[in-house]
Regions:
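Amphipathic alpha-helical polymerization modules
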Residues: 1-117
Length: 117
């Protein structure tokens, strides 16, 4: 029983990290040469999720520089569509895990009530 709560809490922490990475990517999308990051989830033993933050090194688009006509700088490699998908899906996954914690809590409460009789 308790393992379900641990798994859900681990997922909540991981989703919080993914949301933080997404927010950082969006905040820096107009920064020259910024490289986006990605939160990668991996199964943790015995229960839960490990998160690895990886920097994505793909190049952005070339932009004309303000320093001169012959100079070129690089845009960020942030894809706003990808980041918006994260902003939509993460809260739904977060809510689902919260419901899981609540259900486990109610089940444990019921079991304790039965044992207490």
């Amino acid at each position: 029983m308790i393992q379900g709560i641990y798994s859900a809490l681990s997922a909540l922490r991981a989703l919080g990290q993914r949301l933080g990475v997404t927010a950082n990517n969006i905040a820096n999308m107009d920064t020259e040469g910024f490289k986006k990051s990605k939160a990668v989830f991996e199964e943790a033993s015995p229960y839960g999720v490990n998160v690895t933050i990886r920097r994505i090194e793909t190049q952005g688009f070339p932009l004309p520089s303000e320093e001169g006509i012959n100079k070129v700088c690089e845009s960020s490699n942030v894809d706003i569509k990808e980041e918006m998908i994260n902003l939509i899906t993460v809260p739904h996954a977060y809510a689902a895990n919260l419901k899981s914690v609540k259900a486990e809590d109610e089940i444990l409460g019921t079991l304790l009530d039965i044992v207490d009789r």
